[in-house]
């Protein structure tokens, strides 16, 4: 039974990771045109994540036991890799987004600036959603009791961080960043689409698994977090580019820095790329 559940979970997660890479290609020809915020493909993406989370829930304890195994916990390579993944989820993604935006601003490269602003924005927005759910759901983290994966209590998350397991904020941030960066690079630099997608979604997956390894989340927590991050990132990308005159982009994407006679000053870049 558990093997079937695990197989379904793996297949569902594979579908979730593969599908976002196809979405940006659909946006290339209509990037600056009005289009619906939600399309049929979004339902497929959401259904894939939901199916994976539902399949994983009965096996939450199994995944935790496997990753909490003494041999795996003592493995230095795994420990270091998952430590990097944990730090990437928070604060790495936000720092990376802010750094990319700052570099684009300093060099006057609006495409890079666009990439940084939207990736950081997706991380923040997705974690606002996740943070609200955490407080309401009140799910106990695995380190509280590894034998009880169904310990939920409404609004208990207000009381203690130990009861903010569902969903994973680190997974949310990592997948939000991955979805926006992959979407943006797919449009501006099509040849980089697959390398960037594999790198960002692969790193996001390591971040998600690290949270189970560190007994901070159940498998279903990270899958739902990944869903929120991916969907939020794709929605923000679609909205920002189909509404290029939105307030945030209008104010923050036209700012640049230039050096004149040894002095730095702000200037406005063209309204369109």
Located regions from the model:
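Extended, hydrophobic alpha-helical membrane-active domains that insert into or remodel lipid bilayers
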Residues: 63-77, 105-115, 189
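Short coil/turn segments at secondary-structure boundaries
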Residues: 63-66, 96-99, 146
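Interfacial helix-start motif at the membrane-water boundary
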Residues: 76-98
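Hydrophobic, membrane-facing alpha-helical anchors
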Residues: 50, 68-74, 176-179
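Alpha-helical transmembrane segments of multi-pass membrane proteins
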Residues: 52-64
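Short, glycine/alanine-rich hydrophobic alpha-helices that insert into or span membranes
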Residues: 46-55, 97
